[in-house]
Amino acid sequence: MGIRSFRPYTPGTRTRVVSDFSEVTRRKPERSLVVAKHRRKGRNNRGVITCRHRGGGHKRLYRIVDFRRDKHGVVARVAAIQYDPHRNARLALLYYTDGEKRYILHPAGVQVGQEVVAGPEAPIEVGNALPLSAIPLGSAVHNVELYAGRGGQMVRTAGASAQVMAKEGDYVALKLPSTEVRLVRRECYATLGEVGNSEVRNTSLGKAGRKRWLGRRPEVRGSVMNPCDHPHGGGEGRAPIGRSGPVTPWGKPALGLKTRKRNKPSNKFVLRKRRKTSKRSRGGRDS
């Protein structure tokens, strides 16, 4: 994948940096693997906004992605690499020898025409899916299962990968992209390699309109609201928030408050917590 920038013909193109889509080999999706999906627009089943700043955007078709990789021992050929509007990663269209077609997350380096396979006896090659017990130490993996047979739930975004650190008993220690070291059952499956399209972190939308195309509505600062709408609101002119620290619209502490439960049962599987991020890297945006 590569990225392309633009000359400053307009204010929107001055800082615009987008993907060149050079790795995409086929534009139209496989019709048997797409379904229509209702856009929730940040509402729940009662129509109440539960996630702010969502709505609008371009109409999309949802691609059915195979996160389970449960066709063990059946060889598949990579027929195409395609764009997916619902994620930053690309999709690889697989043609299995028994005639079935499936989408998987595109592993970095996998080319059209290459063969991939899943199963405990699969060779140690990028794009193949194996149980963690069969993957060598130090290998990079993605699309990692938390529970055997449920499908990959971790390490699925563009450019992400986890590292196999150790094996002991029924568990394998993985170093996740967040630097957290976590134990996972050895029978859980993972795909070798890292997710492709790692250059997406270098892109820039360039203008507010592109954010609207993605279905993101504007975020209004709390300090410019009325006091009935936000704890930061009110006052004469540009008044301070009048609190020791920023809070959410519902009065809860913002920017750094830990939201994970202290007595969560899965805490025993976390060997090392993720590294803390500084305020500078996290950003001090007014909620």
From Swiss-Prot:
This is Large ribosomal subunit protein uL2. Belongs to the universal ribosomal protein uL2 family. InterPro entries: NA-bd_OB-fold (IPR012340), Rib_uL2_dom2 (IPR014722), Ribosomal_uL2 (IPR002171), Ribosomal_uL2_bac/org-type (IPR005880), Ribosomal_uL2_C (IPR022669), Ribosomal_uL2_CS (IPR022671), Ribosomal_uL2_dom3 (IPR014726), Ribosomal_uL2_RNA-bd_dom (IPR022666). Gene3D superfamilies: 2.30.30.30, Nucleic acid-binding proteins, Ribosomal protein L2, domain 3. The keyword RNA-binding applies. One of the primary rRNA binding proteins. Required for association of the 30S and 50S subunits to form the 70S ribosome, for tRNA binding and peptide bond formation. It has been suggested to have peptidyltransferase activity; this is somewhat controversial. Makes several contacts with the 16S rRNA in the 70S ribosome. GO terms for cellular component: large ribosomal subunit. Residues 258-287 have a biased composition (Basic residues). Residues 221-287 are annotated as: Disordered. The keyword Ribosomal protein applies. Transmembrane segments: none annotated. Pfam families: Ribosomal_L2, Ribosomal_L2_C. GO terms for molecular function: rRNA binding; structural constituent of ribosome; transferase activity. GO terms for biological process: translation. NCBIfam families: rplB_bact. Part of the 50S ribosomal subunit. Forms a bridge to the 30S subunit in the 70S ribosome. Keywords: Ribonucleoprotein, Ribosomal protein, RNA-binding, rRNA-binding. The gene is rplB.
